[in-house]
């Protein structure tokens, strides 16, 4: 099952964001939950869903390890965009890309497979950051054999 309910603790965060929106309504500010916060939520949720052992922050492109020992990179969005990548010395064996619908407190596993499959859509080398489109990451997921996916534990 690709779609899942976000943990109840996320409700408090979304409600606080909504209160900010209401309070500053005349300023037309979005108070978008994005960046590092969404990335951290993605890692925490992925750890719960797949039994990942998260690694200390080390900037290597590896966020944790799956129960079978595979290294895992977790990417997440709450803004309806595809995943962004940087050039790193060490690539993870596996990639999980999660998309959050915070207004409805739902999440979707968009990509669950070897990271190299997703990276085929990017040039072999680049400077800075490069992103896949939503279409590209979904297409990459169709190329993953079922036995190459991580199994959910929850």
Region roles according to the model:
Residues 1-154:
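Nucleic-acid endonuclease domains
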């Amino acid at each position: 099952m690709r779609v899942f309910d976000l943990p109840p603790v996320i409700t408090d965060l979304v409600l606080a964001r909504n209160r900010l929106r209401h309070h500053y309504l005349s300023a037309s500010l979005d108070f978008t939950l994005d960046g590092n916060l969404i990335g951290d939520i993605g890692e925490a949720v992925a750890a719960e869903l797949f039994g990942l052992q998260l690694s200390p922050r080390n900037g290597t492109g590896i966020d944790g390890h799956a129960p079978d020992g595979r290294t895992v990179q977790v990417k997440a969005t709450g803004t309806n965009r595809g995943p962004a990548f940087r050039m790193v010395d060490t690539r993870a064996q596996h990639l999980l890309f999660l998309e959050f619908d915070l207004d409805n407190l739902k999440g979707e596993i968009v990509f669950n497979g070897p990271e190299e499959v997703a990276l085929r859509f990017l040039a072999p080398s680049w400077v800075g950051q490069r992103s896949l489109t939503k279409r590209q990451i979904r297409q990459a997921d169709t190329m993953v054999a079922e036995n190459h996916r991580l199994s959910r534990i929850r």
